[in-house]
């Protein structure tokens, strides 16, 4: 059984996919994005439902860090933490600068590119906030989810197993970004 919820969040909708085989008692959950901060209560209710049913979030994916994709997740997680309704989160997929550097430094033949050689001020523009992404990742690390964060998913195309289902994150390749 598969259930897909498209959760309206103005211009930053998010998705909640629930999946289980007939013989399974609990649903597997995949969450994509989190909507705007104004939708934090809806995101919290989803987390509460998952937690009360004794389920986990098998994979949470942030497609990119615009405020209309991360702020509902961040504020919803904060509310759920206060009420002790954060379910176990098995894996969180997002792209971060730290993940980018780790990936490229690990490639054969690549010259080390220390982060110190690149100085980019942390700035916010309307609708885009690197500071908000930093706050979210800090929260996730403080909550003990650091080892569950996959911080570089560009051209990953790795299989993500959710129960007996296989999912793929599809993204442009490094070449397409150059």
Q: How should each PLM-predicted stretch be described?
A:
Residues 18-20, 31-36, 42-43, 64-65, ...:
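Amphipathic repeat-derived elements
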């Amino acid at each position: 059984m598969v259930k897909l919820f498209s959760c309206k969040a103005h211009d930053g909708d998010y998705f909640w996919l629930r999946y289980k085989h007939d013989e399974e008692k609990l649903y597997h959950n995949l969450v994509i994005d989190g909507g705007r901060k104004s939708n934090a209560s809806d995101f919290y209710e989803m987390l509460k439902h998952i937690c009360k049913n004794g389920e986990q979030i098998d994979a949470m994916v942030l497609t990119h860090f615009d405020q209309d994709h991360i702020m509902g997740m961040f504020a919803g997680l904060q509310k759920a933490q206060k009420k002790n309704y954060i379910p176990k989160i098995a894996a969180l997929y997002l792209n971060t600068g730290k993940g980018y550097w780790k990936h490229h430094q690990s490639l054969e033949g690549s010259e080390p590119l220390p982060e110190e050689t690149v100085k980019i001020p942390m700035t916010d523009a309307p609708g885009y906030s690197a500071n908000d992404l930093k706050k979210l990742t800090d929260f996730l690390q403080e909550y003990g989810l650091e080892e569950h964060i996959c911080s570089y998913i560009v051209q990953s195309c790795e299989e993500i197993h959710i129960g007996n289902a296989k999912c793929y994150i599809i993204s442009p390749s490094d070449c397409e970004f150059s």
